[in-house]
Amino acid sequence: MRARRPLLARRPRRPDRYPPGPLRELAAVPAPPATTPVSRLELLALDVETTGLDPRADHLLSLGWVPVVGGRVRLAEAREHRVRPPDGVGVGASATWHRLTDDGLSDAAAPADVLPRLLADLRGRVLLAHHAPIEVGFVAAATLTAYGARAPLTVVDTLALEHRLRADVNGEVHGSLRLDAARRSHGLPRYAAHDALTDAIAAAELLLAQVAELEQRLGREVLLRDLLPTRSG
């Protein structure tokens, strides 16, 4: 049986397939070629806080992102936006881990107001996240609701990359791959705060440490294709 290709890879960008607006403008900017060296690559590290883990049933509450350009985290261009959930939807038990409250989100922006800013910052860039299916799923759900289509994205997942770096000869990893644990394995400090922007910055710093390790292993400059999931079949 032919193996399936991973979901978190490069998606084709045909602007005419998208409605006029932010999605078409994103698709109109070519994705970086797979042969782009990390030293010339632009990424956007993203983290989201949500009411739960299911993009089909749960809702965005906060998004934080920061560009990573030429191997540097651009903190001056970092952004964080709280998002107001739909009427009648409360934060619920999710407040115990992200500390966002219904009162605190009462004056937050609507998703339709935040999405254009995120999509504009993603133009020509690779989306970076730790356990990226969460971010990809919620961004897809939001753009489907707002624009009727999923955003075309090229995605690097630091959790998947950490699994590749830590797996033994049997493909097994001993220990946690959570963001804090992955950072600790690279000698990076633990952040006391837990919010979307802090976690986006933490993922960005983790990627740079992972790239440094990959360069040592490969004996050459790391390319975008070295960060993407391995395709088979």
Where are these regions (language model features)?
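Acidic two-metal-ion nuclease catalytic site recognized across multiple nuclease folds
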Residues: 1-34, 185, 204-233
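A cross-family kinase active-site recognition segment
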Residues: 2-5, 148, 152-153
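Conserved non-catalytic scaffold segment of RNase H-like nuclease domains
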Residues: 11, 16-140, 144, 150-152, ...
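Short alpha-helix plus adjacent loop in nuclease-associated cores
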Residues: 156-173
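Generic recognition of well-ordered alpha-helical segments
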Residues: 161-164, 182, 206
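Short, glycine/charged-rich beta-strand-loop motifs at protein surfaces that mediate ligand recognition
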Residues: 165-170, 190-196
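Acidic, divalent-metal-coordinating active-site segment for phosphoryl/phosphodiester hydrolysis
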Residues: 195-206
